[in-house]
Regions:
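Bacterial N-terminal signal peptides that target proteins for export
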Residues: 1-9
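Position-driven detector of the extreme protein N-terminus
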Residues: 2, 14-15, 161
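Bacterial N-terminal signal peptides
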Residues: 8-17
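Disulfide-bonded cysteine motifs in exported proteins
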Residues: 18-19, 59
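Non-cytosolic coordination micro-motifs
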Residues: 22-57, 86-175
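Compositionally biased P/S/T/G-rich terminal and signal peptide-adjacent segments
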Residues: 40, 46-80
Length: 175
């Protein structure tokens, strides 16, 4: 009897540890680190911009090979003054709410309007967890719908606000 219990407990522990090791960890660099710390194959696409930022874009399937649930999502690492300032998960034109489900599971549930299907909800929700501000956004885009998760470390929130102000001024000038 004791051997059966031991085998069951060990089997459960292996199952738990195995499933934990397959969880997707898209934060492959720490906030404040330079972009040179990201060493991944294939080499990520780099997009410098006119506002003092540089983005590295990596398909999530390159980061989370054992977890296909978020395939189709792009992970964008935004560097300001060569310091990681924001991580964004961007999932455009997918006919699902997988980023919403991921956000609710990882950061905490939030209420949707009663009777509204998740696929039709548009809006945003914010969490403050530890040293990070996290925002989930569901919005319409030109040819459909996009889900976004933005993670900003509190130490870089002011730099992000200044960066976003520059982007906003430029967008306003384009009207």
């Amino acid at each position: 009897m004791r051997n059966k219990i031991t085998i069951i407990v060990l089997s459960l522990m292996m199952l738990i540890f195995t499933s934990t090791s397959y969880a997707c960890n898209f934060q492959i660099s720490q906030f404040g680190d330079p972009k040179e710390k990201i060493v991944i194959e294939p080499v990520p696409l780099s997009f410098p911009d006119q506002f003092g930022g540089e983005s590295l874009a990596i398909p999530i399937q390159d980061l989370c090979k054992n977890d296909s649930s978020l395939y189709g999502t792009m992970v964008v690492y935004l560097y300001i003054e060569n310091k990681l300032s924001q991580i964004q998960l961007y999932r455009p034109n997918m006919e699902d709410t997988k980023l919403m489900d991921f956000a609710m599971k990882k950061y905490g549930k939030f209420n949707l309007p009663e009777g509204m299907p998740k696929q039709r909800w548009r809006g945003s929700y914010q969490w403050e967890i530890g040293n990070n501000y996290i925002e989930y956004i569901s919005t319409n885009i030109h040819d459909g719908h996009a889900e976004v998760i933005e993670i900003t470390n509190k130490l870089y929130a002011n730099a992000m606000a200044e960066y976003n102000a520059k982007v906003g001024e430029w967008l306003d000038s384009q009207k």
